[in-house]
From Swiss-Prot:
The gene is MST6. The chain crosses the membrane at residues 19-39, 82-102, 120-140, 143-163, 170-190, 205-225, 292-312, 324-344, 360-380, 389-409, 429-449, 454-474. The lineage of its organism: Eukaryota, Viridiplantae, Streptophyta, Embryophyta, Tracheophyta. Residues 40-81, 141-142, 191-204, 313-323, 381-388, 450-453 are extracellular. This is Sugar transport protein MST6. Keywords: Cell membrane, Membrane, Sugar transport, Symport, Transmembrane, Transmembrane helix, Transport. It is found in: Cell membrane. Residues 1-18, 103-119, 164-169, 226-291, 345-359, 410-428, 475-530 are cytoplasmic. SUPFAM superfamilies: MFS general substrate transporter. Expressed in leaf blades, leaf sheaths, anthers, ovaries and embryos. Expressed at low levels in roots and shoots.
Length: 530
């Protein structure tokens, strides 16, 4: 690759091109893969708060709930059931396993076919859940939903990061998280409506309607173009060049094309990406692929979102009121995500992480204190509606803090930091860790709520402190940096630079590496530009 590196304010090459309608349409369609994940997060908590659903599949939980309401017994423990938590969390265990297979499909067949497979599998799972006659049928449907989520979550963030121009990658990639939040909101609204259906079969409608977002991504994937990166990696170089011209809206694509080809040639030297990802030079990316999804789940957000109706019911809301409160948090989630879309490529990833972490910590402390002051350790109390509404207000503020920080960035940053040779393997690790800890926390939340009481909110708050400090010291800024040049960011970081040798950097023939020591990990334009 000839020529030096011309660096813009974000620290990477500014390739010619613009945001074309073709790219915008492709990214919107691909981002709908987030709908299936979001819909499931929202729908599962809603149906588990519907009495007809509990009576049919989890009668012991229903009896415990009724006894708690009549006898003023411990509100913290009335939903504690291993079978109920297995219903919710089985999806995430299936998604964890599926993501490893999705890595191979995504690399060999292309990103779009991985999305298509995820949509079709999710569609079958939705049909099975809607027609469920027993718990086994219900959980089998959840497993198929999980396979669909594993494939979609593995392929969609990669697709968005590869299609988007570097300077707009954050905005377009966050479309995935936006679709997750829209899916959650739609599920909350549907639950609110189906709970009113007479005859007690509204839960079937809620579960079966998961087929709608599944059909959207399955059909939409058929019309999506492959990314230039994927085409080059699979040997279709002429098609890749034509596609790159189309997605960038210019004929001046030679420099970017040559960089993509060089990255692909480098990747083909790696015969075993799963083994190579353990090499010292990939230590920074591997650490982030594990730490970021781990921390994302330890914010406690999925606990709030898919147990929101159950949580609000525990706080004393009636059935309809608890579902409406979940709708309110869903609305906050959607609108706050737009804040991230607008600011992520201007303010950068680090600032949003740090601000969101501070906001979530404050809200966790307030919510835990309010619940503790009223319920104490006994879990027995009547909460006035005004008091409960005050709790919901701070939960909404917490959701907003997550929605413009750890929510979208937890998917964006891991998808943009891996070089092509280990990108699919790296994204699989990211998704697998995310699903593993979603499963663990979903499985553990109701028992933990029963045993830790209001202290549980302080538990998650402590993790928010840890993850915010981790970002402050160890996450470099990656805005505006082309994916193929991300190694420069790690090489220039005060800590991660020690893991990367000069010979591990293959960006340009005339690149002069900056000295490690920049805490933010930003590449100094004065040192990199010729």
């Amino acid at each position: 690759m000839a020529g030096g590196v011309v660096v813009n304010n974000g620290g990477g090459k500014d390739y010619p091109g613009k945001l074309t309608m073709f790219v915008l349409f492709a990214c919107i369609v691909a981002a709908t893969g987030g709908l299936i994940f979001g819909y499931d997060i929202g729908i599962s908590g809603g149906v588990t708060s519907m009495n007809p659903f509990l009576i049919k599949f989890f009668p012991s939980v229903y009896r415990k709930e009724q006894a708690a309401e009549k006898n003023q017994s411990n509100q913290y423990c009335k939903f504690d059931s291993p079978l109920l938590t297995m219903f919710t969390s089985s999806l995430y265990l299936a998604a964890l396993v599926a993501s490893f297979f999705a890595s191979t499909v995504t690399r060999v067949a292309g990103r779009k076919w991985s999305m298509f497979g995820g949509g079709v599998t999710f569609l079958v799972g939705a049909a099975l859940n809607g027609a469920a006659k027993n718990v086994l049928m219900l959980i089998l449907g959840r497993v198929l939903l999980g396979v669909g989520v594993g494939f979609a979550n593995q392929s969609v963030p990669l697709y968005l990061s590869e299609m988007a121009p570097a300077r707009l990658r954050g905005m377009l990639n966050i479309g995935f998280q936006l679709m997750i939040t829209i899916g959650i909101l739609c599920a909350n609204l549907i639950n609110y409506g189906t709970a009113k259906i007479k005859g007690g079969w509204g839960w079937r409608v809620s579960l079966a309607l998961a087929a709608v977002p599944a059909a959207i991504i399955a059909v939409g994937a058929l019309f999506l173009p492959d990314t230039p990166n994927s085409l080059i990696d699979r040997g279709h170089t002429d098609a890749a060049k034509r596609m790159l011209r189309r997605v960038r809206g210019t004929d001046d694509i030679e420099e970017e094309y040559n960089d993509l080809v060089a990255a692909s040639e480098e990747s083909k030297l790696v015969a075993h990406p799963w083994r190579n990802i353990l090499q010292r030079r990939y230590r920074p990316q591997l650490t982030m692929a594990i730490a970021i999804p781990l921390f994302q789940q330890l914010t406690g957000i999925n606990v709030i979102m898919f147990y929101a109706p159950v949580l609000f019911k525990t706080l004393g809301f009636a059935d309809d009121a608890s579902l409406m409160s979940a709708v309110i948090t869903g609305l906050v989630n959607v609108f706050a995500t737009f804040v991230s879309i607008v600011t992520v490529d201007r303010l950068g990833r680090r600032k949003l992480f740090l601000q969101g972490g501070t906001q979530m910590l404050a809200c966790q402390i307030v919510v835990g204190s309010l619940i503790g002051a009223k319920f104490g350790f006994s879990g027995v109390a009547d909460i006035p509606k005004a008091y409960a509404a005050f709790v919901v207000l701070f939960i909404c503020a917490y959701v907003a803090g997550f929605a413009w920080s750890w929510g979208p960035l937890g998917w964006l940053v891991p998808s943009e930091i891996f070089p092509l040779e280990i990108r699919s393997a790296g994204q699989s690790i990211n998704v697998s860790v995310n699903m593993l800890f979603t499963f663990i926390i979903a499985q553990a939340f109701l028992p933990m709520l029963c045993r830790f009481k209001f202290i549980l909110f302080f538990f998650f708050g402590a993790w928010v402190v840890i993850m915010t400090l981790f970002v402050a010291f160890f996450l470099p800024e990656t805005k505006n940096v082309p994916i193929e040049e991300m190694v420069l960011v790690w090489k220039s970081h005060w800590y991660w630079g020690r893991f990367i040798r000069d010979e591990d950097v293959h960006v340009g023939a005339d690149v002069e590496m900056p000295a490690a020591g920049n805490r933010n990990g930003k590449v100094d334009p004065a040192k990199l530009a010729n």
